[in-house]
């Protein structure tokens, strides 16, 4: 079940059965999955599967969270809600995070600090406002022609 998926993660991180069940119920409620708690995880829609993955990760009470293209495959209409979920993970759980995602608008909205790479090389590091105005980043993501026309 969806609940068992989250409980197993908490148990694997050392929580006792009671704490694992409490943690699962809390996370499912906070991530909007409580109505599916007893449903098979395989029956979830894609966006709900993504939220379940976040719940499983948070059940382990990590200090660091790596999100590698967490909204990949979601319909565009669901991306803002998922961005809000990522923000709440950052703000409420206090975990340091690393977010890998090609949608620069989403990255700029969610992240406090960016490390931009192009072909494995660092282009720039800094706050979103600094990165937004960086010509090397613009050239890499928009193409040199687009930068020259601006």
Spans of features found by a protein language model:
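ABC-type ATPase nucleotide-binding domains, specifically the catalytic core motifs of the NBD
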Residues: 1-19, 30, 126, 142-145
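Conserved ABC ATPase "signature" region
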Residues: 7, 18-36, 84-88
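Conserved ABC ATPase signature
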Residues: 40-44
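Conserved catalytic motifs of ABC-family nucleotide-binding domains
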Residues: 61
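Catalytic Walker B motif of ABC-type/P-loop ATPase nucleotide-binding domains
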Residues: 65-69
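A short, surface-exposed alpha-helical micro-motif characterized by mixed small hydrophobic
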Residues: 107-109
């Amino acid at each position: 079940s969806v609940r068992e998926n989250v409980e197993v993660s908490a148990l694997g991180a050392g929580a006792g059965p009671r704490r694992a069940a409490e943690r699962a119920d809390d996370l499912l409620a906070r991530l909007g999955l409580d109505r599916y708690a007893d449903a098979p995880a395989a029956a979830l829609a894609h966006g709900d599967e993504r939220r379940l993955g976040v719940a499983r990760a948070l059940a382990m009470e990590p200090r660091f969270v790596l999100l590698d293209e967490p909204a990949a495959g979601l319909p565009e209409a669901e991306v803002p809600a998922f961005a809000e979920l990522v923000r709440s993970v950052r703000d409420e759980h206090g975990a340091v995070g690393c977010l890998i995602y090609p949608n620069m608008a989403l990255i700029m909205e969610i992240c406090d600090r960016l490390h931009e790479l192009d072909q494995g090389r660092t282009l720039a590091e800094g706050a979103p406002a600094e990165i937004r105005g960086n010509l090397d980043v613009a050239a890499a993501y928009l193409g040199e022609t687009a930068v020259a026309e601006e």
